[in-house]
Amino acid sequence: MFKKTLISLSIVLPLLFLGCSSDSDEEKSMVASSTFHLVDTKGVDYNVTKEGLNFYVKGHDGKVVMFDIFATWCPPCRAEAPNLSHLQKKYNDELLILGVTIEDGIANADLDAFKEKYGAEYAIVNSKDNEKLYRAIASATKAGQRFPIPFMVMYKDGQYITHYVGQTPEEMIESDIKKALGK
């Protein structure tokens, strides 16, 4: 009997300790460095580098960068498009808004139709790296792998500023942009 208990414990205890490991794949990926190559509907390239929890967009140092993770079928995403366009125009030299669609296989023509219909006058990227990027951002912000949209995340010089879940008033976003810019 003692022998069976000892054998059982020698099998079960290592399995328990494996389950208690603090280095999950998600945590490891948060520390790792990655580069995401994004292309908008006009063919403009954006290279986003993730270093730890920070996200940098090459060539946009000093700007506030906001990733708008959205879908064309999402009513709150549609409603926010004109507000984001207004902010992009107002803070043009200090702000970069990148719309990141969660829709696989959507045609650029469909995204351009969305931009036209809902007044989205900011870059919308449609690349094979979209999903990798929005999952990395969701992981870094601890939003989980299933998060509501729109999901917007703001960075300044790669550093996380804030994020918004769901439709957010333009005034709230603008207030955070001003704070990030030191205004």
Where are these regions (language model features)?
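Short pre-active-site segment immediately N-terminal to redox-active cysteine/selenocysteine motifs
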Residues: K63-V65, I69-W73, D104, P148
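Short acidic-hydrophobic, aromatic-tinged amphipathic segments that line or gate anion-handling sites
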Residues: V48-T49, A123-S127
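Active-site-proximal beta-strand/loop segments in catalytic clefts of secreted hydrolases
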Residues: I69-F70, V100-E103, S127-K128, V165-Q167
